[in-house]
């Protein structure tokens, strides 16, 4: 027998024994009446909602995704925001939209409460802004019902600031190692490529970050066993990055000095440093790299 929906949802249902009609939330689309046949098991590879307290979700979801493929493609981009731990209920809020709970005895959709959205937005919108992304219109809190309606509530204040929660570890490639010029040159000689790049797009596949480069803003400093054909793909990888944070690479509009190795046909980043425009250190490093013979 599958387990029940969890204490949170039981509390929601208990407080609303007599339900009126609830409107679907398809942003800019007509209301939609869900049917029980639209309940789907939450797949194991929907990592955004891994460990959520219910097992079945509705399709289409509250963001208008009609297939599981769409959900998986779009949900991965939000995993880093959860990893930033800007609010304890970020995952709950996002999963209530990407994978809304589906209960056997309830045909209506359960949306996130207005207060849940407001709290998450207040804490997480500044984090998104630092990455160059505004809070999207589809997540505007005025779209969600007030707390006296049937909705997913904010956690109790007892759980807002977990005292024992460990700080997320920093990705090895993103650690500030306080290297001098000699250290940087030594690191470069150990790697297969060194590039100055700007980021066009970041996506997330399984546990890894896929970084798509702006092709016209790329400067090549070193290639060893890496062909021009490899670089034409304009794709770099930051491995296992969803298990750690990378503050060094938190601005999609900034240029970066990246070094790495070719592993299994992929260009994998082992070191990343934000390139401060006009900074003397990077101008000096740039000259040193061009003269370097490993």
UniProtKB/Swiss-Prot annotation:
It is found in: Secreted. One of its GO terms (molecular function) is Wnt-protein binding. PROSITE patterns: FZ (PS50038), NTR (PS50189). It holds the Pfam family Fz. Keywords: Developmental protein, Differentiation, Disulfide bond, Secreted, Signal, Wnt signaling pathway. InterPro entries: Frizzled/SFRP (IPR015526), Frizzled_dom (IPR020067), Frizzled_dom_sf (IPR036790), Netrin_domain (IPR001134), Netrin_module_non-TIMP (IPR018933), SFRP2_CRD (IPR041764), TIMP-like_OB-fold (IPR008993). Coiled coil: none annotated. Residues 34-154 form the FZ domain. Disulfide bonds join 39-102, 49-95, 86-124, 113-151, 117-141, 171-244, 174-246, 189-294. The keyword rRNA processing does not apply. The FZ domain is involved in binding with Wnt ligands. Belongs to the secreted frizzled-related protein (sFRP) family. Soluble frizzled-related proteins (sFRPS) function as modulators of Wnt signaling through direct interaction with Wnts. They have a role in regulating cell growth and differentiation in specific cell types. SFRP2 may be important for eye retinal development and for myogenesis. This is Secreted frizzled-related protein 2. The lineage of its organism: Eukaryota, Metazoa, Chordata, Craniata, Vertebrata.
